[in-house]
């Protein structure tokens, strides 16, 4: 039965994909890339841009906007699927898995409540693929528990690992032994996944041209695996967007020196790949003058809610009725609040790129469903992990 469903879903995906090929902004601009880069339309794109009027008024930032990647989830007859920024990457990653590798199983990494791992599980399931999520510990929260239960709902196989070394060793063993398994790195941030945000920059350029927003002076994003930053930065060069990209780092201080290096690495690699496919995609110097790494809101360790993020969650909910979360998106809002408090955003056009899907999917599961999770993950529901408040 699953193979029949897989064939039907894949056929539908191919039909949709072929239609979408001619429509996505990256392929419109560089049609030769279309001939070589697999793509499946998974999300509801383009995502809208709208003003954050109430929050902007409170911050004395009257041109504050939001890019609604919380709404990337594909809409079905029943409800809207989980979204967030990872859907953009998965449109290229899962296409590569299917068309170039004939994959049947998708393997990826994350923390216990990883939004990336969850999105991978959901869209792999939609394409009839198995998903194995190799997860590590993180501070407990309602978001973590919500995501774990959604992982289970979409039939993902969850595996717990105490550290990166053990997990990497297990992944290497799995890939050698499993038939047609395809590995997606943490955050989907490799030269394939990051194409989703090169394309997103052209999507933004189209929205600027049609008057949905003036070219932003500043674009705020949270960054972890650096793919969103690298893709946007490269796409901005090709689309001639001169905005400054404010990347709010979410990892602890000891890892911060790695971020610029990783963004540069991905930028150069993807730029060279695209130029090789279509010579009209120029080779660009790395634009350090457009990139700002904000290190003020990283917190003591991954997933720990800092006071500034808790305040940002409350403000967004009270002023705009939009849910953000404390690990990533709220830290970008916290940076906007901080910069606005110094007057730095007066007379500026500011865009907050919301990477988090804040839709509540708890109607899909029962709280007691956690007992069907592997034992290591049941502990998040039984008080064995320190709770992060105000998520």
Label for each model-derived stretch:
Residues 1-5:
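Positively charged n-region of N-terminal signal peptides that target proteins for export
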